[in-house]
Design a protein with these regions (language model features):
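Cytosolic ends of transmembrane helices, especially the final helix of ABC transmembrane type-1 domains
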Residues: 1-16
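ABC-type nucleotide-binding domain
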Residues: 16, 31-218
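Solvent-exposed, non-transmembrane helices and loops of integral membrane proteins
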Residues: 21-32
Length: 218
């Protein structure tokens, strides 16, 4: 009974949450290179994405999604009276691997939460491929990023279905390609039914490392 009451309290607290305000007007679209080497929009799934925004002339403009992240003089605190991050300047190049090392509460996870706009900064600017993240639609911003937490969660279903949760419209071939990029394809092929192997109980029939690889592929 006590657990049910606690669960009910969490559900009602979630229902009482105010919807997020989507302030941005920059969207994410499928893209390709035109004959003149400019980036253009397409309805095809090309594996290439671009930011779409309306220029001063009223025409759509496109910037290829590359993953360039810049923090400029960023201040942030969960409480305005207690700043956790102060005057942070950071440049993450596309394809670069960056490790944040520090004690618990130093703000390592906070930085990733700011990039996703789970929280907004008090001062400064965060740029994503040259665009202020506040000008990007939150759905577009978050769909362009992948977060794999230390504690991963899998669902009852096949390996293929668990990978596809990352993008429900993905084909089997795209899911397999994602698994190869995440270095998960090798162990998946050694499972009893490969990509059709059923996972139950949060993927308890897999090792922690294998669950992490599936989460990365997702």
């Amino acid at each position: 009974v006590v657990m049910a009451l606690a669960g009910g309290a969490r559900i009602f607290a979630l229902l009482d949450e105010k919807p997020e305000v989507n302030e941005g007007d920059i969207t994410l679209v499928h893209a390709k290179y035109a004959a003149d080497d400019t980036v253009t929009e397409t309805n095809e799934s090309t594996g290439m994405w671009a930011w779409k925004h309306i220029g001063a002339d009223g025409k759509p403009q496109y910037t290829e999604l590359k993953g360039d992240i810049v923090f400029k003089d960023v201040d942030f605190g969960y409480d305005e009276k207690k700043i956790v991050l102060h005057d942070i300047n950071l440049y993450g190049r596309p394809g670069q691997k960056i490790a944040f090392v520090g004690s618990t509460g130093a703000g390592k996870t906070t930085i990733t939460n700011l990039i996703n706009r789970f929280y907004d900064i008090q001062k400064g600017q965060i740029l994503y491929d040259g665009h202020d993240i506040k000008s990007i639609e939150k759905d577009a911003l978050r769909s362009s990023l992948g977060i794999v937490l230390q504690d991963t969660h899998l669902f009852t279903g096949t390996v293929m279905e668990n990978i596809r949760y990352g993008r429900l419209t993905a084909t089997d071939e795209e899911c397999m390609a994602a698994a190869k990029l995440a270095n998960a394809d090798t162990f998946i092929k050694h499972l009893p039914d490969g990509y059709n192997t059923m996972l139950t109980g949060d993927g308890t029939n897999l090792s922690q490392g294998q669950r992490q690889l599936l989460a990365i592929a997702r």
